[in-house]
Each structure stands twice: as C-alpha cells, then as structure tokens.
Amino acid sequence: MFNYVIILPLALFLLAYKFFFTSKKQRYYLPPSPSYSLPILGHHLLIKPPVHRLFHRLSNIHGPIFYLRLGSRRAVVISSSSLARECFTGQNDVIVSNRPRFLTSKYIAYNYTTIATTSYGDHWRNLRRICSLEIVSSKRLANFLHIRKEEIQRMLTRLSRDARVGKEVELESILYDLTFNNIVRMVTGKIYYGDDVSDKEEAELFKKLFTFITTNSGARHPGEYLPFMKIFGGSFEKEVKAAAKVIDEMLQRLLDECKSDKDGNTMVNHLLSLQQDDPEYYTDIIIKGLMLGIMVASSETSALTIEWAMASLLNHPKVLDKVKLEIDEIIGQDRLIEESDIANLPYLQNVVSETLRLHPAAPVLVPRSTAEDIKIGGYDVPRDTMVMVNAWAIHRDPDLWTEPERFNPERFNGGEGEKDDVRMLIAFGSGRRICPGVGLAHKIVTLALGSLIQCFDWKKVNEKEIDMSEGPGMAMRMMVPLRALCKTRPIMNKLPAYTKV
C-alpha cells in the first residue's frame, strides 16, 4: 500500500511534466537554458546562494535572458537594462505585472490580497491608490516628521553612550531598531525599542518572523516549487502556516489598540476612518495586509542600506572625509541635520545612490508573473512564467557604469557621458509595481546616514578591510554584521540627551 502512495503521485507528476514542459518546447522559442536539468527537479540543484551572483554567472554563459525550470515552475531571468526596460514599459508592463503564487503569499499575505502579492487588477490599483495618496503621500509623511527626528535622536543618544567608553558597536541591530521604530510608530503609534519599553520580546519576534519571510519568499525555498515534497515529510508549508498565525495575531493586537485610541494620528487610524465609510472593502484583513506590507518592505531594507553605506565608507575613508566635510560646511556643528537639508547635500545623496547601486536591498527584484504569452528579447515567454530581474547585475554592467565594481559616489555628479546615469538604478523596482514607499525609504536612509556622519568620527575595529560578503535571502544582508568604533563629535555635547532610549 505504501508503494502505491509513493509511486502514484510521482507517476502523475511525471506525466504532467511530460505534457506541460516537453510538449510545449515544440511550440515555444524559449530563451537559452543551462543544459543540466533533471526530470521533476529541473534546475533546482543549480540554485545556490547568493542567487544574484549565480544568475550573473549564468547570464555570462547564456546571455542577458535565460530560462530555468524550477520544479513545477517556469522562470526567466533578465540581467540587462534594455530587456528590463522592455518588460517594464508600455503594454508589456501590464502583462508582466502579476505575482507568482507562493505559499508565503497565500498564508502570510492573506491569500494573495496584499499590495505586494496580489495580481494586477482593480484590487491592486485600489491598494496602490491608497498607499500613494493616503499612506505615503508627501503630506502624510510630513505629519510624521517629528517621529523620524525623535528616532534619530534616540539612536544618536544610544550610540553616544557606547562611544564615550570606547565600546565597539554592532550597527545591524542599532539600525534595525531605528527603522523598525520609525515604521511601526508611523503605522500604529507604538514604540518597540527604548529603555522605557516593555515589549522588546514582541519586537524581537516580529524581527524573527520578518526575517523568515524575506529568507523564504520568492521561490527561495524548494517547498514553493516542489509540492510533492510534503508527501515525503516536507514541513515548509506547516512552518509557513505557523508563522502566518503568529503574525496575524500580532497585527490584530496592534489593530485593536488603534481602534481603542480613536484620536490617534497614525496610518492605521486613517485606514480605520476609511473603514467606517466602506466597511465591506476596508476589512480588518485589508488593513492588516497594508500594515504587513509597509512594515516588512520598509524596516529591514532601510536598515540594510544604511549598514552597507557605513561599511563602504569605512573601507573608503577619503569618501567618508569628503561627505563629512560637506555636512560640516553646509550645516556645521551647532544643529542636527534635518530632512530639509538633504537637497543641499548632493555628495551625501551620491553616497546613498552608490550604495543602492552596489548593494541593492533586493538584488533580484520581487518576481513578477506573465498574465499571457509574451515576447521578451525576441524569445517566447509563456503565460504564468516567473520573471526575475537581476538588479545587482544591471547595476554592475560595464556598458552602463564606469569601473562598475568600484565604490565611487562621484559618478553621479551629472556629467555629459552616456554612462553613470542615476536614472538607471532600479533598486526599488520599475514600472507599475515600483515600490510605493521609495520616498519614505530615501528620507530615512539619507537622514540617518547623514546624522551618523555628522555626530561621530568612525573607524574600523582593526586594519583589515570590512568583509563585504553577502548573506542569503531576498533581502541582501551582510554575511558578517558590521562592527565599528565611533567617537562623539562636538555637536553631541550641545544636544540634550534623549532619555527614552
């Protein structure tokens, strides 16, 4: 009996493979593909982290677009700016604006109903409108300026305590606390990190769950494209369901707290006012999905970008000195840098742009899916094919960038050449599904980085180069979290201590 339980599903899967893949090869002119492909598994055994570097190596062999079969899923990988532009402009941008259906999207993202996971259509357009006009609009972000300023001062005071005793600081956790507090306060009004906070355990659980999402989303776990694995005891779906249950309970508690505070000035309180006008559409699930999307997309990625920027500056002390000089000349040591100053700090902006070029938080953009058959680069891309764009490879294309492996913020000074154009950056995506929170991310990253440089002198813990190796997952972490030494600059002696750290 056991043999039939094992053999029958495998036989059915092989028949499906024969029908859906082998027969269709005769009809489609597919992009080039690695020759090493196994029945059922396809190219699964080729996939090793970091995926963006693997895809870059494969593109050097097979060209700027190539085809993969990941178990039951088709995928194409794009590694050139021109082909990415072909995907993300005109009618193609509509056809390639769906999302693949993953287990994480089904269970954690409320059955594919969040802005990041739902397919293109009326529901997505409405969510996008809500985000752009009601949640991350310029007016709404201006209302939360005091939060961003307070959280910056909280971080600076925390760092100054370590700096005064010459303590080595680990920046990853400090930066995550900064960005997470920023986002959650804007969304719900709650503070998770600080001396007077009693919910640090819940905050750490949120961090653990968000890391689970970014590590396992986007076809990074074989359980997403080898569904038969659960027959052999694969536990991925159970793990996703368990994580989804905990996340939903935590989001519901935050939502209930906002409901009880009817005078609150948060993103959720604004969504609750929309719920009163249209309760059938703005359900608790829709609101929790928006909360989840903003918190996952904004907190970790911003922290990682600041960390990569600091690591790059520590490895390039002359660049660090130059951006420090710019801040000192424009702002001085009598007041803290503010968001309104950023427009007058072009070199600081260049440093952020160069960091996003070399170390995009999502090196392979969130996968899209084709709504119908389409041609890309002259090749057939069938319906329901995952389309993955390797932003990391495009950002290091020697046809687009001068000395692409070199950290060089001066490249964005606005010369007349055809290369080094900041408009070629796609760190936040492109087309219809570009990240709606890009403006907020730039504000948090640039202000935080400028504040760290203005208020402290930084140096490496030893003479060795900072290890710039990359970790696995959808969000590109440093393999070795950044540690550094800092010393307070005169401005910190003029600022009152922010006690609620």
Curated annotation (Swiss-Prot):
Biological process, per Gene Ontology: indole glucosinolate metabolic process
InterPro entries per UniProt: Cyt_P450 (IPR001128), Cyt_P450_CS (IPR017972), Cyt_P450_E_grp-I (IPR002401), Cyt_P450_sf (IPR036396), Plant_Cytochrome_P450_Monoox (IPR050651)
Transit peptide as UniProt keyword: no
Alphabetical list of PROSITE patterns matching this protein: CYTOCHROME_P450 (PS00086)
GO cellular component, as recorded: endoplasmic reticulum; membrane
Pathway of action: Secondary metabolite biosynthesis
Cofactor(s) named in the record: heme
Topology in the lipid bilayer: Single-pass membrane protein
Cross-link (Glycyl lysine isopeptide (Lys-Gly) (interchain with G-Cter in ubiquitin)): 245
EC number(s) given by UniProt: 1.14.-.-
Keywords for this protein: Heme, Iron, Isopeptide bond, Membrane, Metal-binding, Monooxygenase, Oxidoreductase, Transmembrane, Transmembrane helix, Ubl conjugation
Residues the entry annotates as binding heme: 435
Protein origin, superkingdom: Eukaryota
Localization per record: Membrane
Transmembrane annotation, as ranges: 285-305
Any Pfam family hit: p450
Any GO molecular function: oxidoreductase activity, acting on paired donors, with incorporation or reduction of molecular oxygen
Purpose of the protein: Involved in indole glucosinolate biosynthesis. Catalyzes hydroxylation reactions of the glucosinolate indole ring. Converts indol-3-yl-methylglucosinolate (I3M) to 1-hydroxy-indol-3-yl-methylglucosinolate (1OH-I3M) intermediate. This hydroxy intermediates is converted to 1-methoxy-indol-3-yl-methylglucosinolate (1MO-I3M) by indole glucosinolate methyltransferase 1 and 2 (IGMT1 and IGMT2).
Family, similarity comment: Belongs to the cytochrome P450 family.
PANTHER family linked: CYTOCHROME P450 82C3-RELATED, CYTOCHROME P450, FAMILY 81, SUBFAMILY D, POLYPEPTIDE 5
Protein name per its UniProtKB record: Cytochrome P450 81F4
Species this protein is from: Arabidopsis thaliana
Lineage: Eukaryota, Viridiplantae, Streptophyta, Embryophyta, Tracheophyta
